[in-house]
């Protein structure tokens, strides 16, 4: 993700982030299935999706910690 996309994610509400996280997890499942069957065209997409999942989880955790501090 680019810096601009990360800023957009940070300004999103947790419900939207959770929905996006679910979509990315489903996409990762499909990519892994395609990899196992030999149909995956772009193996780098798996890395990109995993990185996006980690970034969204980090943003959700930051929001959670910020809420606990207040």
UniProtKB/Swiss-Prot annotation:
Q: Which UniProt keywords apply?
A: Ribonucleoprotein, Ribosomal protein
Q: Name one GO molecular function term.
A: structural constituent of ribosome
* Record bears the keyword Ribonucleoprotein: yes
Q: Which GO terms describe its biological process?
A: translation
CDD domains associated with the record: Ribosomal_L29_HIP
Q: Name one GO cellular component term.
A: cytosolic large ribosomal subunit
Asked whether the UniProt record includes Nucleus among its keywords, one would answer: no
Q: Which top-level group of life is the source organism from?
A: Bacteria
Family, as annotated: Belongs to the universal ribosomal protein uL29 family.
Q: What is this protein called?
A: Large ribosomal subunit protein uL29
Q: Which organism is it from?
A: Clostridium botulinum (strain Eklund 17B / Type B)
